[in-house]
Amino acid sequence: MNKEQLQQMRQAPGFVGALDQSGGSTPKALKAYGIQPDAYQSEEEMFDLIHQMRTRMITSPAFATGKIIGVILFERTMRGKIEGMPTADFLWEKRHIVPFLKVDKGLQDEANGVQLMKPFPELGKLCEEAVGYHVFGTKMRSVIKQANEQGIRDIVEQQFQWGKEILSHGLVPILEPEVDIHCPEKAKAEEILKRELLAQLDKMTEPVMLKITIPTVDNFYKEIIEHPMMLRVVALSGGYSREQANELLSRNHGVIASFSRALVEGLSARQTDAEFNAMLEASIEDVYQASIK
């Protein structure tokens, strides 16, 4: 594990960019960027286009301002290159950004008010590959739809079970038990989640990171942020607009952003580089300001 990267993730001001759209969400991401589905004929072409979009973002001067401390990548982006360098190496060596890899394979159908991650027996193999690419950590998402005690306990147990396997490969996991912002009893679900997270953290011997939905009650996750086994807590934008997400985030001290959609809002394939860079820089500045409050 890279100690300098560990320090950066523990305390550097800034936020984590999420560029980890996978097969299912790529068409939506491309459409928002102004590339219609008829612009590509195959999955291969679709992934090439999204790689071009991500390359444009990562090589933009806006990405070199030191305000983004980490970035979450999709597998194919990790295996790809930027300006002739493997993506993770380019991020760290040219941008001083810590690379993470999305490792889950999507969600199971809802049961007990939650969606667990699909089983993934190849997790260890993917972790080894990530280590070979000089990736620092991972991220995996599951979703809480209802304030169901059993369901939430299952979600947290699965996240920590995967997390321990990831740690055994020398990677730092970002656990992401997202609470759906439309959950009818969101505050109650968050109470159960916090209790279960603290119970698991108390049993850990190595620190992890956590990615959460911005809580209903401001500063609700304070004990988790201060827990010795918690490296950093980041927040997802969860369907809020960037403005709304930034506003909510700025009220939660010690939590930094890990936005995907909110980061690419307003970017378009048709923009000139100057327009694209200016828009990206403004987005990064907004999210950064909300993260350091």
UniProtKB/Swiss-Prot annotation:
InterPro entries: Aldolase_TIM, FBA_I, FBA_I_Gram+-type
Pathway listed: Carbohydrate degradation; glycolysis; D-glyceraldehyde 3-phosphate and glycerone phosphate from D-glucose: step 4/4
Signal peptide (UniProt feature, chain positions): none
Classification via Gene3D superfamilies: Aldolase class I (3.20.20.70)
Keyword Lyase: yes
EC number: 4.1.2.13
This protein's record includes keyword Lyase: yes
BP GO terms, sorted: glycolytic process
Catalysed reactions listed for this entry: beta-D-fructose 1,6-bisphosphate = D-glyceraldehyde 3-phosphate + dihydroxyacetone phosphate
Source superkingdom: Bacteria
Active-site residues, as the UniProt record annotates them: E176 (proton acceptor), K211 (schiff-base intermediate with dihydroxyacetone-p)
Protein name, entry field: Fructose-bisphosphate aldolase class 1
Organism of derivation: Porphyromonas gingivalis (strain ATCC BAA-308 / W83)
Taxonomic path: Bacteria, Pseudomonadati, Bacteroidota, Bacteroidia, Bacteroidales
